[in-house]
């Protein structure tokens, strides 16, 4: 599903975010990426949907080499990915329903099918009763659940999340992770970056711990 082979990522000025990074995530797997702030977790996740490209090495996602992927092909790659980043980019002038609908508006789904998918996604994250609300009316945990609903409305085979429980209380954080576990249980591959070792320890799943851009 996802394979990194001798991947390095360097930024202008010489900052090396990742170095000689190799690992593979199998189809249907749930894995956590842990490490301190600055360890390279966010950079790693951004390479998967080609938000950034590796400086060297290969990143293979669903059989496609990210380094060789043409710019025009990137939107097609991302249609099969669910992305939950720290900057949720929710539209605060639109309803919860409209926010969840956004990915489908770009993919040409028939209106009835799109509406069915949106309601199903909101139901899975416990927001079906809030579909007419504005995101500003939601709690931090509810806003994160809305971001997840938007990420899964296209029924992705791979779901990646960068610090999805950051700034949430313990109860909300646990609920967010349970949502990811539930998607994994129906076959979705899930990759989560987090610094919360306590939450990770509860699940007994594979952990990739990064230190200075490498798997420790």
Residue spans for each PLM region:
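ABC ATPase NBD coupling module
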Residues: 12, 66-82, 185
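Helix-to-loop junction immediately C-terminal to a conserved catalytic motif
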Residues: 49
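Conserved ABC transporter NBD signature motif
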Residues: 57-65
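Conserved ABC ATPase signature
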Residues: 134-138, 142-144
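A short, proline-enriched helix->beta-strand linker immediately N-terminal to the Walker B motif
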Residues: 153-157
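Catalytic Walker B motif of ABC-type/P-loop ATPase nucleotide-binding domains
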Residues: 159-162
């Amino acid at each position: 599903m996802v394979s990194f082979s001798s991947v390095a990522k360097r930024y202008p000025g010489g900052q090396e975010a990742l170095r000689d990074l190799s690992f593979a995530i199998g189809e249907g797997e749930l894995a956590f990426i842990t490490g301190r702030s600055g360890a390279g977790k966010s950079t790693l996740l951004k390479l998967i949907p080609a938000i950034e490209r590796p400086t060297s090495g290969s990143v293979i996602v669903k059989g496609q080499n990210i380094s060789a992927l043409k710019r025009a092909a990137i939107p097609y790659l991302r249609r099969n990915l669910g992305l939950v980043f720290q900057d949720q980019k929710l539209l605060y002038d639109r309803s919860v329903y409209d926010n969840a609908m956004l990915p489908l508006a770009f993919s040409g789904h028939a209106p009835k099918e799109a509406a069915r998918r949106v309601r199903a996604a909101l139901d899975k994250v416990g927001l079906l009763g809030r579909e007419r609300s504005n995101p500003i009316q939601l709690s931090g945990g509810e806003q994160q659940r809305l971001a997840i609903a938007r990420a899964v409305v296209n029924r992705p085979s791979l779901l990646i999340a960068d610090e999805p429980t950051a700034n949430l209380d313990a109860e909300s954080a646990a609920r967010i992770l349970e949502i990811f576990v539930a998607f994994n249980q129906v076959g979705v591959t899930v990759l989560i970056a987090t610094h919360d070792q306590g939450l990770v320890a509860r699940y007994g799943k594979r952990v990739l711990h990064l230190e200075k851009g490498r798997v420790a």
